[in-house]
Design a protein with these regions (language model features):
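A glycine/serine/threonine-rich, flexible loop-to-helix segment
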Residues: 25, 37-65
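Alpha-helical segment proximal to the catalytic Tyr-Lys
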Residues: 21-25, 90
């Protein structure tokens, strides 16, 4: 599944650049968020189904892979999305925001 996941991530980034180039003259901005692990019910369900009785240990292992020491919270991702859509970010287009607790650059 790593191949499909990586390909999809790359596709979102290049699609963002294409949209930004194609629509910038119309005043339409395009940016993308590139999060690392986000603590959602999906993570909890995955751990429960795949590591019964070891969920807490596996959760700690997942968090330890993040330089910041934890997974993102959905509200943190939403806050960046709200900013990108706001007038405060009116000069931002064609950008990819790594919101990953340092995973990309500090790992």
């Amino acid at each position: 599944d790593r191949f499909a996941y990586s390909t999809s991530k790359g596709a979102v980034y290049t699609m963002t650049l294409s949209i930004a180039r194609d629509y910038v003259k119309r005043g339409i901005r395009a940016n993308c968020l590139c999060p690392a692990r986000v603590h959602t019910p999906f993570v909890d369900n995955y751990l429960r189904e795949n590591y019964p009785g070891k969920e807490a240990a596996m959760f700690s292992e997942l968090e330890a892979t993040q330089p910041i020491g934890r997974m993102a919270k959905p509200d943190e991702i939403a806050a960046l999305a709200a900013y990108i859509c706001s007038e405060e970010a009116a000069f931002v287009t064609g950008a990819a925001f790594d919101i990953d607790g340092g995973f990309t650059l500090l790992k």
